[in-house]
Curated annotation (Swiss-Prot):
This is UDP-3-O-acyl-N-acetylglucosamine deacetylase. It comes from Ralstonia nicotianae (strain ATCC BAA-1114 / GMI1000) (Ralstonia solanacearum). Pathway: Glycolipid biosynthesis; lipid IV(A) biosynthesis; lipid IV(A) from (3R)-3-hydroxytetradecanoyl-[acyl-carrier-protein] and UDP-N-acetyl-alpha-D-glucosamine: step 2/6. GO terms for biological process: lipid A biosynthetic process. The keyword Metal-binding applies. It catalyses: a UDP-3-O-[(3R)-3-hydroxyacyl]-N-acetyl-alpha-D-glucosamine + H2O = a UDP-3-O-[(3R)-3-hydroxyacyl]-alpha-D-glucosamine + acetate. Its cofactor is Zn(2+). Zn(2+) binds at H78, H237, D241. PANTHER family: UDP-3-O-ACYL-N-ACETYLGLUCOSAMINE DEACETYLASE 1, MITOCHONDRIAL-RELATED. The active site is at H264. GO terms for cellular component: membrane. HAMAP family: LpxC. Its EC number is 3.5.1.108.
């Protein structure tokens, strides 16, 4: 039986909120089978638990934001991406602010944190959402689509028309049947443009943004002194974001995802469209491990870790 996973022990870190610029303490705790991933605002009285679900995603303008009863947890996509990449089904995420710390702008710190806590299998079958007919959403020239595929692969195309981005490649495709999330995706950093950062700061946002946690571009070049972590780091980060955005559906997806200029909002609209059509998906488990898609096999976990 392919089993659910959680972490073995409690682990904690401190980082900076991207928009508030304030110190944020993040604590990850093991959770029981079937629990899912639950974010808790422990700084509120009483504390507010917000399950990571597609319907709980509210604001998507700058990040994926979970909302419940007026409480918010922003910028969840990088941590959710790491959980997807390591096959974590059940987890408590305690945070003492309204955003997850940005760390280095990628998912690498969260992968390290989860691996440091240890990952263990639980005595319940891992559940998947298998897409059985295509679902597509559009917004102008933007597109996001899920199609039947016995595995998990993603294809993403961006169009930024910037010298630094143009020369790195604007399309990337990855199939986790034979590719490592940790090696090929997790270290890709978020990116932005200097003039946009200044505009955000004028309205009280992006106060924690810096060259330490993002790739920053002016009109012509990259302002960071360090090299890109991948030759096509920009589009790989969009894949990283998409993996995190899609994981709030509640279970790993058995599907092929294709996107053109998609973002957090369109990714969430895609999940809602999928869940609204009961003929488009089914919930499945695998009693025999060898019958599961290769991307999710435990002995090949490094291929999706």
């Amino acid at each position: 039986m392919l089993k659910q996973r959680t972490i073995k022990s409690v682990v904690k870190t401190v980082g900076i909120g991207l928009h508030s610029g304030r110190k944020v303490t993040l604590t990850l705790r093991p959770a029981a089978p079937g629990n899912g991933i639950i974010f808790t605002r422990v700084d509120l009285d009483p504390a507010v638990e917000i399950p990571a679900t597609a319907s709980a995603i509210g604001d998507t303008r700058l990040a994926s934001v979970l909302q419940k009863d007026g409480a918010r947890v922003s910028t969840v996509e990088h941590l959710m991406s790491a959980c997807a990449g390591l096959g974590i089904d059940n987890l408590y995420v305690d945070v003492d602010a309204e955003e997850i710390p940005i760390m280095d702008g990628s998912a690498a710190s969260f992968v390290f944190l989860l691996q440091s806590a240890g990952i263990e299998e639980q005595g319940a079958a891992k559940r998947f959402i298998r897409v059985i007919k295509p679902v597509e959403v559009r917004d102008g020239d933007k597109l996001a689509r899920l199609e039947p595929y016995f595995g998990f692969k993603l294809s993403f195309t961006i169009e930024f028309r910037h010298p630094a981005v143009d020369k790195t490649g604007q399309t990337f495709e990855i199939d986790f049947a034979d590719t490592s999330y940790t090696r090929e995706i997790a270290r890709a950093r978020t990116f932005g443009f200097a003039h946009e950062v200044e505009m955000l700061r004028e309205i009280g946002l992006a106060r924690g943004g810096s060259l330490d946690n993002a790739i920053v571009l002016d009109e012509h070049r990259m302002l960071n002194n360090d090299e890109l972590r991948y030759g096509d780091e920009f589009v790989r980060h969009k894949i990283l974001d998409a993996i995190g955005d899609l994981y709030v559906v509640g279970y790993p997806l058995i599907a092929a995802y294709t996107a053109h200029k998609s973002g957090h909002g369109l990714n969430n609209a895609l999940l809602r469209a999928l869940l609204a059509d009961e003929a488009a998906y089914e919930i499945v488990t695998f009693d025999k491990v060898e019958e599961a898609p290769r991307a999710f096999l435990p002995q090949l976990q490094p291929a999706f870790s």
